[in-house]
Amino acid sequence: MANLKELRSRITSVSSTMQITKAMKMVSASKLSKAQDAITQMRPYSEKLTQLLQDLSATLDDDAGSKYAEEREVKNVLIVAISSNKGLAGAFNTNIIKAVKYKAKNDYKAKNIDIYTVGKKANDILKKEYDIHKNNNEIYDDLSFENASAIAEELMQLFLDEKYDKIVLVYNQFKNAATQIVQHEQFLPIEQFDSEENKQLDYIFEPSKLEIVKDLIPKSLKMQLFKALRDSFASEHGARMTAMHKATENATELRDDLKLSYNKARQASITNEILEIVGGAEALNG
C-alpha cells in the first residue's frame, strides 16, 4: 500500500485536475448555449434558401446552367476539413481527421487531393500526409458571416479558375451536446435538381428567373459554408463540455478511492503505533 505522503500528494493532484475540468465544463456550457442558439436560428433560413435554389434550378433550361454547376472530369479535389484550434474535446477532431482520410483513400483514390484546413488540430495531423492548400485558424476569432463569406469566395474562385474540379466540406454537424454527426457535403460544383414537382411551381420572377438564380447561388454557397462553420463551432463546445463532464466524474471517483485508501492506511498506521506502545509497556512491566 502506498505511504501516506504519496497518497496525500495524489489526492491533491487529482483534486486540482478536477477543479480544472469542472471549470472548463462550465466555460464550454456557456459558449455552447450561445452557439446552439445561433445554429438553431440559422437553420430555417439556410434550409429555405436551399429549397428556393432547388426550386428555381429545376425550372431552368439545361443551357442556362450556372458556371458554379459546371461538371468537369474530376482530376483535382479540394477537401475542406473543419476542425478546432483547441483540444480536450473528446473525439471531435479525431472524427474529422478519420473522415478526411477515409474519403481521400476510398472516394478520391485516383485523384490529386489537397486539403484546406480550418482549425489548428486538423492541420497539425493532415499536413503530415497531404498537401495543405491553406490553413485558416483565424476564423474562430470572429465567426461572422462576412469572414465565412470571404472563405467561400476564395473557394468559389478556385473552382472557377479550374484549380479544382470538386470541392467538398467535411465537418461535425451539431445534434445535441453529446452527439455530433460527421458530414461530407459537396460544395462545388453545386448539385443539380430536376424534379417534376419543382418544375410545376408557379413563381413570378422580377427581374428574371436566370438573374435571380445567378445572384442566389453565391449567397447560397456562402450560407452553406457559414452553416457548416456554425455547426462545427457548436459541436466543438458540446463535445468539450461532455468530455470535461466525464473527466470530472472520473476524477471525483478516483479522488474518493484515494481518500478511502488514505484513511485505511492512516488507520493501519495508528493501529500499529498503538500496538507498539502497548507492546513496549508490557515489556517494561514484565
From Swiss-Prot:
Residue ranges of the TM segments: none
Cellular compartments annotated: Cell inner membrane
Membrane topology of the entry: Peripheral membrane protein
Superkingdom of this protein's organism: Bacteria
Pfam families: ATP-synt
Molecular function (Gene Ontology), one example: ATP binding
Main localisation: membrane
A biological process term (GO) from this entry: proton motive force-driven plasma membrane ATP synthesis
Keywords: ATP synthesis, Cell inner membrane, Cell membrane, CF(1), Hydrogen ion transport, Ion transport, Membrane, Transport
One cellular component term from this protein's GO annotations in UniProt: proton-transporting ATP synthase complex
Purpose of the protein: Produces ATP from ADP in the presence of a proton gradient across the membrane. The gamma chain is believed to be important in regulating ATPase activity and the flow of protons through the CF(0) complex.
NCBIfam families: ATPsyn_F1gamma
Name used for this protein in its record: ATP synthase gamma chain
Record organism: Christiangramia forsetii (strain DSM 17595 / CGMCC 1.15422 / KT0803)
Source species taxonomy: Bacteria, Pseudomonadati, Bacteroidota, Flavobacteriia, Flavobacteriales
Name of the gene: atpG
